[in-house]
């Protein structure tokens, strides 16, 4: 994401969308009543005919839709300004925002929202995770919106079809090279339970740096192991998803011990945030996209309070491995600096 222009007085923020995570963040920050300006197309009647015409419109947002791991955000609303000759003011319209597009968002920006936009604009690292042994292959791409599984399949056994270990490793390396070409990661982590991963590594012909680690299996369980380890921070310090996994694990451990250094639920978390007790706040992303504006505003206010007092806020997307655990705890969990009871 690139911030092209920001007018603090009018609240107009012009952005250039560079990847799917940018779209996800825009989806999270948009609220009903915000104004967006973007290029779009619309069917316009021309006499007896109609054709799709490109134009720039100003839209008052009603709601937005984003499907994780897609390259399009749909913004629905009412046209407030458009070329007069098309007569579409006051009509419903949907802007399809894609990677590479520009958008102007006009709203009342809180410090927390602007900080999240700026933080996203500073991010640039992407890592590809490859879990493999001679029987299985899983390739994943951690993103702000969750873990995108690119492939998860069984490999032809070494004894099948006269396949040798070397030939299976070559097959895996070629597939990984295609993903590297497609997603341009800054680094690749190859992990697995045995020596097969080193054979794959030796056959890879790629520019990104390669890291190797051991896990118990080339499966989603192995992926969760990687996300909890320090190696992930070496190559993806900008991603919250691995840190969030470990922070939730810490919070659950404190709960199991009956510790007063962890609270969950809106009322308890809100109270802790107001007195500066929150060290780390975990929030499920659906609390920021609710149609219930009051709940959304209260959640954003809690996040603002935590950040203003030096606490960390981590947004946990639906595709995160820890989403359901956090959701079962109301979607809000705070690890505290000091006891408040």
From Swiss-Prot:
Annotated EC: 3.1.-.-
Q: Which Pfam families match?
A: eRF1_1, eRF1_3
What's its job? May function in recognizing stalled ribosomes, interact with stem-loop structures in stalled mRNA molecules, and effect endonucleolytic cleavage of the mRNA. May play a role in the release non-functional ribosomes and degradation of damaged mRNAs. Has endoribonuclease activity.
Q: Which domain of life is it from?
A: Archaea
Q: Which GO terms describe its cellular component?
A: cytoplasm
| InterPro entries in alphabetical order | eFR1_2_sf, eRF1_1_Pelota, eRF1_3, Pelota/DOM34_N, Pelota_arc, Ribosomal_eL30-like_sf, Transl-rel_pelota
List localization entries: Cytoplasm
Gene assigned in the entry: pelA
**Complex and partners:** Monomer.
> According to its record, what is known about the domains?
The N-terminal domain has the RNA-binding Sm fold. It harbors the endoribonuclease activity.
Asked if Nuclease is a keyword of the record, the answer is: yes
**Which keywords fit this entry according to its UniProt record?**
Cytoplasm, Endonuclease, Hydrolase, Metal-binding, Nuclease
Q: What is this protein called?
A: Protein pelota homolog
EC class, as a word, reads hydrolase
